[in-house]
Every structure is written in C-alpha cells, then in structure tokens.
Amino acid sequence: DVEVPNPNGYLSKDENDFPDETKAFGTWAYPDKRLELSDEEILDLWKYAETIGLDFIVSPWENNSVDFLVKNGAKCLKLASIDTTNYMFCEYIASKGVPTIVSTGMTNYHQQSIVWDIFQKAKCSMMFLHCTSAYPSPLEDKNLRCIFLMKEMFGCDIGFSGHAIDREGTLGAVALGANVIEKHVTLSRNMSGPDHAAALEFAEFADLVTKARNMVVALGTGRKSFLDSEKTLHGVLCRKIVLKKNINKGSKISKDDLTTFVTNKEGGVLPEAYYEVVGAIAQKDLVKNQILEIVDYK
C-alpha cells in the first residue's frame, strides 16, 4: 500500500514563517508548502497506484480533505498520530464509515480507548498502528510490547509504523503480531527534504519486505508437534529402551532393569514410554542388552 499525507488547511496563515536556519529532521524547515500535493496530483497518484495493484491511502488533516477523499471513493483513511487525540476530528472521520488506520504516537492507552469508543459508536472499522513519533525513533523508545498489549485490550488488528532505517523494529513487531507495517521509503537518503534521512531506499525496503514475510512463515501455527523435517535427525539419534539385565517371564519390570541406547533399528520402544514400562509384567523371558518391544510387556 502507499500512503500520502494531505495537510491542506491545517496550518495558520503564518505557517511558513520559519527562519532558513531552522531545520527539523532532514534538510528543510518543516512544515513546508512546497511539499504539498494538489488534489489533482493526489488523484493522478491514486490512479497510478491502482494501475499497479497498490491500495492508495491518504492521511487527511482537516474535514475538507476527508470529504475530498470520501467523494473520490477512498477505501481506507489514515489518521496521523498528532490527530489521534483530536477527538472532534476523529468523530468526523468515523462518521464517514470508511475503514481507518489510526497511528498512536504520543498517546497513552486511555486516549486510545477514547478513540476506540468513537469508532465503535460510529460503527466504523478501524485499527491502531503502534508507533513512536520521533524521526528516527531510537530502539529503546520503540516499546514493541505495546503491540501485544493493545491486541489484548482492543481485540482488533494492530500494526506498526517504524520511523527509522533499522530492521529490528519492524521484524520485532511482526513477531509480536503486527498485521500492518508502515515504512517511509525514498529514492535516496541524500535527497533534500524532511524524512528522507529516516527512510529506507527501495532496495533496502525490498529486503525488509522479504525478511518480514519470512518472519511470518517462521512464526508458524503455534501448535507443537513432531515435524516431518525432524524425522531425519530422529532416525539417526533416537534412543530405544534396552534391558540392563535378564528378566524372567512374569516378573515386574523396575527402573533399575532399564537403560536407553541410540539405535536406528526399526521397532523398539521409545524412552517416552518409560512410565508405562516401569511396573509392567514381562510377557516372556527377556535378556540383557535386548531392545524392548511393545509385545514384551503388559
């Protein structure tokens, strides 16, 4: 998916009155009207994204932008972290009934619960993105455990927005159950403008996508069982229960009568049957170093 911010109308009339030497992260003063896209440019990007099979998601910053997006058939909206506690704006977005992704930088669980209630009351589908609103976000501030806790608290999908070039945040988020990942990408981190230095270049992004998908595969089902891939090693190293001494037919088998040997011989009783064997009755005469078979005891 591709996400584009749409900040029209969110600043005062003096929004660009920044001295040239005042810099935010990156290389330009931020915010900057030069970075904005017109409605026509957004529609052009939207159309292009659809032709290459991408969902196009925009972060509106005021009501008119919400109306523009809904009018043009937006399938999903994105609420920026700075507006997550702007409850009147949350209500407006939720009233449109368009599924919404809500970023949660700079918020706490109580504030998130208010937003959750707003969307639930409006019967508008939504999910949260866990994130840290710092560019780049330090590893120690990523606080990925929130993902698991938020899943438990709200019972909805939780994603992760990683504002850095590291891989650990994204891969850790996937391992903790994040369903959506947001990353900034750029043609080059040497380009002028905010956010470029905290973004991945496309080759790096492709590598991260591969690793994230591999992580999903590696997570598996959570069911623990004997796997087909383990059969080879099991066949080479598995142990069988072996008699340490002769045992007469009708005698009770004790733990002192038993040991285990590594053997690739077919049949035999595996060590996991130990508690079943101890106390059982020998059904025939058994000899020292004999591999115990299931028919030998009862």
Where would I find each of the regions flagged by the language model?
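Catalytic cores and adjacent flexible loops of soluble metabolic enzymes
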Residues: D1-K298
